[in-house]
């Protein structure tokens, strides 16, 4: 079972991640929400995590198209939980498997998506999107690396785990 598998694994905390809302910049809803917009530089340097940065009211995106990851994906689960916690039902136009695909489709202006700050800190800057902080604790998670307990850990893996991922 999945629960007993957890005890058969070892893990390493990779990083904390926070989901953000990525909205195509040409959506008119953005003009009414400028005080909530976060520059990509503040996402990359972590300043957006400050409690002084306000979360966007999700209901403002009520009639907009959303790109959501499937519910067997943690990001997809969290996106739906965030929506439920905010009494909001997204109008879903795409259900996808990967954050990167959702990001690329959002860049094309085809919908709003939930995206992690780890991905945003590693992709080239795209001026076609506007970013917003999400409300609640469901937008925050810890990312782990897992491996089977008792398995040989190669020198390459040891060195990889020592790398600074910030």
Where are these regions (language model features)?
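Short hydrophobic/charged patches on amphipathic alpha-helices used for structural packing
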Residues: 11, 58, 102-103
């Amino acid at each position: 079972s999945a629960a007993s598998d957890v005890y058969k694994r070892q893990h390493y905390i990779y990083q904390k991640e926070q989901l953000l809302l990525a909205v195509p910049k040409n959506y008119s809803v953005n003009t009414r929400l400028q005080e909530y917009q976060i520059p990509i530089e503040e996402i990359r340097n972590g300043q957006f995590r400050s409690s002084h940065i306000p979360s966007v009211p999700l209901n403002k995106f009520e009639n907009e198209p959303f790109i959501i990851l499937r519910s067997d994906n943690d990001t997809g689960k969290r996106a739906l939980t965030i929506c439920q916690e905010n009494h909001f039902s997204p109008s879903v136009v795409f259900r996808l498997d990967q954050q990167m695909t959702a990001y690329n489709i959002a860049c094309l202006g085809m919908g709003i998506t939930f995206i992690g700050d780890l991905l945003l800190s590693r992709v080239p800057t795209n001026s076609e999107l506007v970013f917003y902080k999400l409300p609640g604790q469901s937008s925050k998670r810890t990312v782990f690396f897992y491996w089977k307990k008792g398995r040989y850990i190669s020198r390459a893996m040891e060195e990889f785990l020592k790398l600074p991922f910030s």
